[in-house]
């Protein structure tokens, strides 16, 4: 039986972008329906992405720190890795958050329908699951269906030892020899996790750099610190993956030199993600897709059909949960009649590796490309009392200032908890702060966050925690 549902707003997808949009719509008094293909809210991020990866990265960090404590006089035995318990702990964390979302949905009186959605017209869509079929008529729709991993056509993905990020986070096993293809954020984070859990990890990338948006002085610090964790090979691509009963046999080309018959127990393909829009029936309603495969939207997240919105990964890069959350808020507010726009000055990015890498605004090389008259101010963490005391002095805080007005235009941090520090830099850029604003803001001592204030002091020529090279200028 085809049931008919009527609503003011239908949101397709319950990841961070989708549930944020639905919750905001409900808070603004709009009758809201949420459609989710799976049995739990939260999308990739909460269920098989951001949250489980951070749970495992925390475990990896503790393992590494415990190992390094021997130099202080505290030694531990080799850790006993119980994969079943780790998986249960990871799922406990996921369940706690998804259950919280479910509770908030109920309290907001948002109706939810599980199943696959496809547009029938620009005012209706069909939702089907194994038991039911619904037709939902709406005034406004928000598409928030997220993204999926990109596959390499020449690799036999039907073999259970060829993984994507979801497989890697399910902890199927801890492979003795593990190959990761792709040195983006996902690849580097998975390398961090599995090397800590005992795998011998090779990570390869066909390009001559990893995380290409960051500056070389930031990436070089990271590269030096991972030498004992895993093997990073750039300028390397896969030639062939042969499936055998006991192993995956890989041939690769490293810096134009063939490397043949390398045995791996598992291979993770982490070369990026693509918008999850193929099965929505967008062609039926004439929804425009841009040249990069994303749904085309304006700064109010409207598509070319004004009452249909797109947010999150389907609406363009950067494909980050926090960007999608803010887009969800804007879309809901526009639907409710508010004249709001999605126009952030900057969006932060973080690689939750060990050490972490975080950046926001312009990098130095981007400032060069834009012909900006800029100046770099760096505070090295080997001059930070807190970093030295915490055994994390490998790192630096780097700020970029426009020399014409001394305003901050970008920042990068590599080091422990860099992701927790970068927010101050983002706020400073959004607020239009200049170096003096940051330098005269009293930061607590000893903290890692004071490295931001001290970097501004380097620019100002007032720093006393390192040599002041501006004294005679």
UniProtKB/Swiss-Prot annotation:
The active site is at 445 (proton acceptor). NAD(+) binds at residues 182-186, 205, 270-273. One of its GO terms (biological process) is 2-oxoglutarate metabolic process. One of its GO terms (molecular function) is flavin adenine dinucleotide binding. FAD binds at residues 36-45, 54, 117, 313, 321. Disulfide bonds join 45-50. Its EC number is 1.8.1.4. The keyword Flavoprotein applies. Binds 1 FAD per subunit. It is an enzyme of class 1 (oxidoreductase). Homodimer. NCBIfam families: lipoamide_DH. Belongs to the class-I pyridine nucleotide-disulfide oxidoreductase family. Lipoamide dehydrogenase is a component of the alpha-ketoacid dehydrogenase complexes. This is Dihydrolipoyl dehydrogenase. It comes from Buchnera aphidicola subsp. Acyrthosiphon pisum (strain APS) (Acyrthosiphon pisum symbiotic bacterium).
